[in-house]
Amino acid sequence: MSKIESQAGELQEKLVAVNRVSKVVKGGRIFSFTALTVVGDGSGRVGFGYGKAREVPAAIQKAMEQARRNMVKVELIEGTLHHHVKGTHAGSTVFMQPASQGTGIIAGGAMRAVLEVAGVHNVLAKTYGSTNPMNVVRATIEALADIKSPEQVAAKRGLRVEEILG
């Protein structure tokens, strides 16, 4: 399903999906390939890219470049999430919650690739609805981007961190 493509500098790159698509023209079909990739630094930055070309390597290259341009910051604490979070894109809904040390990444398919490159080591996650890799990746990154640290929540509410954490 997903494989480690390369280690460019400090970024981890994973290929999530490759599809053959076709365009029907008067003379027949023109085939091309699409690639979905995720890129992360392993410590809280992650992005995804979608590339399309006549050859697989070119599609992967385009996707990797787009993923590097579209990275977002994720708030993590000791390799897990601050709080449970839900993300939705199109027909896909993802739910993630923090897990204790040693749990590992309990997630399937495209969501696992995103969490691995983002630097999340312990998480419980579930996908509901569509399992289309593109929608799952978008929903996962949207959910990760929504995570707020206790410091951010305290600042927004005008309280001290101790009051937020109880």
From Swiss-Prot:
Pfam families given in the database record: Ribosomal_S5, Ribosomal_S5_C
Cellular component aspect of the GO annotation: small ribosomal subunit
Keywords associated with the record: Ribonucleoprotein, Ribosomal protein, RNA-binding, rRNA-binding
Molecular function per GO: rRNA binding; structural constituent of ribosome
One of the GO biological process terms: translation
Keyword Cytoplasm: no
Record-linked Gene3D superfamilies: 3.30.160.20, 3.30.230.10
Domain S5 DRBM: 11-74
Lineage: superkingdom: Bacteria
UniProt-listed InterPro entries: Ribosomal_Su5_D2-typ_SF, Ribosomal_uS5, Ribosomal_uS5_bac-type, Ribosomal_uS5_C, Ribosomal_uS5_N, Ribosomal_uS5_N_CS, Ribsml_uS5_D2-typ_fold_subgr
Record-linked HAMAP family: Ribosomal_uS5_B
NCBIfam families found in the cross-reference section: rpsE_bact
Family per record: Belongs to the universal ribosomal protein uS5 family.
Subunit details: Part of the 30S ribosomal subunit. Contacts proteins S4 and S8.
The record's note on its domains: The N-terminal domain interacts with the head of the 30S subunit; the C-terminal domain interacts with the body and contacts protein S4. The interaction surface between S4 and S5 is involved in control of translational fidelity.
Function text: With S4 and S12 plays an important role in translational accuracy. Located at the back of the 30S subunit body where it stabilizes the conformation of the head with respect to the body.
Protein name as annotated: Small ribosomal subunit protein uS5
